[in-house]
Amino acid sequence: MKDLENIPALMEDIGKRAKAAAQQLATASAAQKEQALNAAADAVWAQRGEIIAANAKDLEFGRDKGLSSAMMDRLMLDEARIQGIVDGLRAVAAQADPVGAVLDEWTQPSGLRIQRVRTPLGVIGVIYESRPNVTADAGALCLKSGNAVILRGGSESLHSAQAIHGCLAAGLRAADLPEDAVQLVPTRDRAAVQELLTMTAYVDVIVPRGGKGLVGLVQREARVPVFAHLEGIVHIYLDKDADRKKAIDVVLNAKTRRTGICGAAECLLIHEDIADSIGKDVLDLLAMGGVEIHAEEGLPGPDSMQVATSEDWGKEYLDAIIAAKKVASIDEAIAHIRRYHSAHTDCIITENDAAVAQFFSELDSAILMHNASTQFADGGEFGMGAEIGIATGKMHARGPVGATQLTSFKYLVRGDGTVRA
């Protein structure tokens, strides 16, 4: 390893080793990758005490740094969350290997037999904030998809990430795969991020996972293609034909289950026909649950509601706060969402099939939901085992980015001495 003070040399060394490892990993068997991931899961559980101790150092660092309660929640690991990491690793291990899957095949009049086959991307750089579990999720998904990965976690999660990375390395060793297939940048120096964004000779794609500031920095300065995971400005629209119980259950879960995740609801739009009934009931229960409501003036609700300002529309709180507004129609709700959303996840609560069809047709978020909590906007809940993030762009990957989304394809063309006329 190069001197940690010489960041360009450090990152070039990491890049070279990642590229070499990617070439080996691309041809690794499905059984090897499955073995590596299960061995990593075993190591994480066996070393949970060490991981929690490392996390305690990060929590102290975060408190000293003045992190918000939402960021501290994202940073914290306990035995239950470590069990979640283990389960995620095993779920990815159990998935079908995407590499080598035949996506399409056909025969041309010339006699050429053509197959389109899934292949790894190569080397993926993942830049993320706070959540140490991303170390495991990203490492697992890149390994499953035959990609080498360079992980650059947040400065506040360095000790936790190092402990989890050690378990991934143990899994690679157990399966006789190159340890350089999953590397963690071993410094908090931000210059390492700048280097990673420009390593076109070694890195094939960058995946940023974090707040608007991080994603914006990556999009501005990266010379490598980017899968953008923007903030989750998530809307729920309560239609005039909403079912009361479904509305209450879905909205409360979408806002309060975990307030600091990107799938948490941030804005509630209520049709004026139900504002005095279902809408008020939902707002009353949110307030009783400790949620601070920033509402448009005149919206029926609890006395504790604050008057919303223009800054509340299009805001990702990541906290026990929600904006609320009355709308005259589904058209007004869709117009509001189009103006303020981040194309992440939006939801309609209704029993009207025509309203669902209009909502799904006229909005273009990566995930659109009907009568379901937006906290299901998660790769694990989509059956992907885990996710690197929710891609909100429109190129290549969109929605939860799992192992399959971390692949490309190539064409295999077979002839029999075939020549072109």
UniProtKB/Swiss-Prot annotation:
**What biological-process terms (Gene Ontology) are attached?**
L-proline biosynthetic process
> What cellular-component terms does GO give this entry?
cytoplasm
Q: Recorded E.C. number(s)?
A: 1.2.1.41
Which leading EC class covers this enzyme?
oxidoreductase
GO MF term set: glutamate-5-semialdehyde dehydrogenase activity; NADP binding
Pathway the protein takes part in: Amino-acid biosynthesis; L-proline biosynthesis; L-glutamate 5-semialdehyde from L-glutamate: step 2/2
Query: For this protein, what reaction is catalysed?
Result: L-glutamate 5-semialdehyde + phosphate + NADP(+) = L-glutamyl 5-phosphate + NADPH + H(+)
Give the UniProt keywords, A-Z: Amino-acid biosynthesis, Cytoplasm, NADP, Oxidoreductase, Proline biosynthesis
- InterPro entries the UniProt entry points to: Ald_DH/histidinol_DH, Ald_DH_C, Ald_DH_N, Aldehyde_DH_dom, Glu-5-SA_DH, GPR_dom
Pfam families under this entry? Aldedh
Q: Which residues cross the membrane?
A: none
**Localization of this protein:** Cytoplasm
Known role: Catalyzes the NADPH-dependent reduction of L-glutamate 5-phosphate into L-glutamate 5-semialdehyde and phosphate. The product spontaneously undergoes cyclization to form 1-pyrroline-5-carboxylate.
Please report which protein family the annotation says this sequence is part of: Belongs to the gamma-glutamyl phosphate reductase family.
Q: What is this protein called?
A: Gamma-glutamyl phosphate reductase
Q: Which organism is it from?
A: Ruegeria sp. (strain TM1040) (Silicibacter sp.)
Q: Which gene encodes it?
A: proA
